[in-house]
C-alpha cells in the first residue's frame, strides 16, 4: 500500500478475513483445509479478473498476492487425494489469468514471521508453528527458483522496517527499479508486480 501511495499506482490487496473457513481451519486443519484453500483460489481468480476489467490495458498495478500462492499453500495443507483434485481447479484458474511481469518476494525467516504474527495478536493464528512457516517458506522458494516466464526478485526484509523507515523503503524501491531495468523491455504490461509475502495464510 505504501508503494502504491508513493507512486500513485492502483493496487489489489487480498481480504483474507472474508474466508468463512479460515478460523475453523486453524482449529481443525484436516477437516477444513480443502474448503479454505478452494475458497481462497476461487476468490483470488475472481478478484484478479474483476480488477483487471476496471483498469486500462497498459496501466501498471501492484498486488500483494498471486494465484501461485494457492498452489504453494494447498501443497502444504492438503492430503494427496484432495491436492490432485485441487490442482485441476488451480490449472483452470491459471488459464484465465495473465502472468505478472515481476514478482517481488519479500523474504524473512520463519522466526521473524512468527514474532510478527504474535505481535499482531490475531486469536486464530496463535497456534501457528515455526515448522509450518518453514514448510511454507520452502514451498515458495522451491516454486520461485524454477524458470518462469516472469522475473522474480528475492529481497530479504529480516533486518528492515519498511513501514517506519524511509531509508529501508527507498532501498527496496531502488533495488526493484535496478532489477527491472536490467531487462531491456521498453514498457511494463499489466499486471506489473505482485508482492508475495511468505505469511501464514
Residue ranges, per PLM feature:
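Glycine-rich phosphate-binding loop used to anchor ATP phosphates in small-molecule kinases
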Residues: 32, 36-98
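A glycine- and Lys/Arg-enriched "phosphate-lid" helix/loop adjacent to the NTP-binding pocket
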Residues: 70-141
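NTP-dependent small-molecule kinase module
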Residues: 118-127, 131-201
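Conserved beta-strand segments of alpha/beta enzyme cores
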Residues: 10, 61, 151-153
Amino acid at each position: 500500500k505504501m508503494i502504491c501511495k508513493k507512486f500513485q499506482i492502483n493496487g489489489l490487496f487480498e481480504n483474507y478475513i472474508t474466508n468463512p473457513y479460515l478460523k475453523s481451519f486453524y482449529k481443525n486443519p484436516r477437516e477444513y483445509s480443502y474448503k479454505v484453500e478452494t475458497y481462497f483460489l476461487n476468490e483470488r481468480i475472481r478478484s484478479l479478473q474483476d480488477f483487471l476489467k476496471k483498469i486500462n490495458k497498459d496501466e501498471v498495478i501492484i498486488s500483494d498476492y498471486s494465484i501461485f500462492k494457492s498452489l504453494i499453500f494447498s501443497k502444504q495443507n492438503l492430503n494427496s487425494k484432495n491436492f490432485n483434485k485441487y490442482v485441476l481447479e488451480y490449472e483452470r484458474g491459471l488459464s484465465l489469468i495473465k502472468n505478472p511481469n515481476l514478482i517481488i518476494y519479500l523474504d524473512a525467516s520463519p522466526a521473524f514471521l512468527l514474532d510478527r504474527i504474535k505481535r499482531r495478536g490475531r486469536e486464530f493464528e496463535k497456534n501457528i508453528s515455526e515448522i509450518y512457516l518453514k514448510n511454507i517458506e520452502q514451498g515458495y522458494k522451491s516454486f520461485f527458483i524454477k524458470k518462469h516466464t516472469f522475473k522474480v526478485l528475492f529481497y530479504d526484509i529480516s533486518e528492515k522496517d519498511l513501514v517506519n523507515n524511509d531509508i529501508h523503503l527507498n532501498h527496496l524501491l531502488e533495488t526493484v527499479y535496478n532489477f527491472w531495468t536490467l531487462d531491456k523491455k521498453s514498457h511494463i504490461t499489466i499486471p506489473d508486480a505482485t508482492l508475495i509475502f511468505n505469511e501464514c495464510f
